UniProtKB/Swiss-Prot annotation:
Involved in the transport of copper. The lineage of its organism: Eukaryota, Viridiplantae, Streptophyta, Embryophyta, Tracheophyta. It comes from the Eukaryota. This is Copper transporter 5. It comes from Arabidopsis thaliana. GO terms for cellular component: Golgi apparatus; late endosome; membrane; plant-type vacuole; plasmodesma; plastid.
């Protein structure tokens, strides 16, 4: 039976039926894995935000206006932008998947797993994202699954 409240034991099932902890060694390895994946989530979020800001800053300047005040062309070329957009979308998808897996791991209601995830997210933010100068104000969300 699955726990519906926080508990503090070493026996836990994380994400899959085959990922069960029944000893201190397996439990500590699980906590380390949760910590590492949480920090990796913040690393990917940082890469995604930096990639997005780089791709938006590389946009070509607008074409010069004609004498009538209309700029041309109406539809910009999208050769390199589509590749950058596809990479950005892929990074977002991987980041979202990791975030949802972290959320599901926290829903095991094991106190140690929950703390390992929160500490991993905090450490990852401190290492990878704390010096980004507020560039992520629109995406600064404490929920790792969004």
């Amino acid at each position: 039976m699955m726990h519906m409240t926080f508990y503090w034991g070493i026996k836990a099932t994380i994400l899959f039926d085959f990922w069960k902890t029944d000893s201190w060694l397996s439990y500590i390895l699980t906590l380390i894995a949760c910590f590492v994946f949480s920090a990796f989530y913040q690393y990917l979020e940082n890469r995604r935000i930096q990639f997005k800001s780089l791709s938006s800053s590389r946009r070509a300047p607008p074409p010069p206006r004609s004498s009538s005040g209309v700029s041309a062309p109406l539809i910009p070329k999208s050769g390199t932008r589509s590749a950058a957009k596809a990479a950005s979308v892929l990074l977002f998808g991987v980041n979202a998947a990791i975030g949802y897996l972290l959320m599901l791991a926290a829903m095991s209601f094991n106190g140690g797993v929950f703390i390992a995830i929160v500490v991993g997210l905090t450490a990852g933010y401190a290492v990878f994202r704390s010096d980004d100068g507020g560039a992520d104000t629109a995406t600064d969300d404490p929920c790792p699954c969004a």
